[in-house]
Amino acid sequence: YLAAVRDAEVALPEEISRELPAIVSAAKPDCEQQQWITLGDSTELVMVTSMMTGKRAESFPDTTECFTMNQGKLWVTLPYDLEEHFRRRLPTCNDSTECRMRLVQLLGLPPTCNYDCLLIFYADAKSIIRPTPDNETTDHEAELCFPDAATAEYREWFEKNVQSSYHSNFPYPWTRLGYTYDWNCDTPSHIGPGEFIVKKGATVKIARKVDCWTWYKELSTKK
């Protein structure tokens, strides 16, 4: 894991993926698996998923209504993208422990984290960014440098996250290239699913809360 952190700290041009999933609009989904809903005021929400503890998942209200997410920002992936990457890397799981740890690795999370649940929800697409120097979500690759349009606020957040990711007591292999770092030593590629951030204050709607093992068992029955 620490080797992954050191590797991720240096982002190289050859590490750029040109196949990142994009978030554009309900009228122009990136693929047929991408799920959207449109509210009465024309706000468009796309389905995303975030791994967390079951306790934190339960802190989100059990409601079928939309609400404003005030719990802070969430790092997320797109459900179908997570499923595709997981199935390619681990076609079969022996038990819940193996399943959970493989998800932790795939998402670039520390081995000591106790996440065991997936929160699947819809989020306002306009409140989602890609955690890269150019943070738009509508294309399929990231840039290595900030565009002129990058705000001072975003640049400051980005640089602070660089410091906390690589130079703190709790480091993360943040790629800054729009995908997670899969740190499993036997993985054919360290390029994980595309990652995004849902900002605090976003309009969201909970789809479901599911433990990792149940998620995998359901995934294993899909064709």
Regions from the PLM with identified roles:
Residues T77-Y80, Y122-D124:
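Short His-Asn-centered micro-motif
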Residues Y80-E98:
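Short active-site loop/helix that positions an aromatic residue
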Residues F60, R89-T92, P133-E136:
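Surface-exposed beta-strand edges and their flanking turn/coil or helix-capping segments
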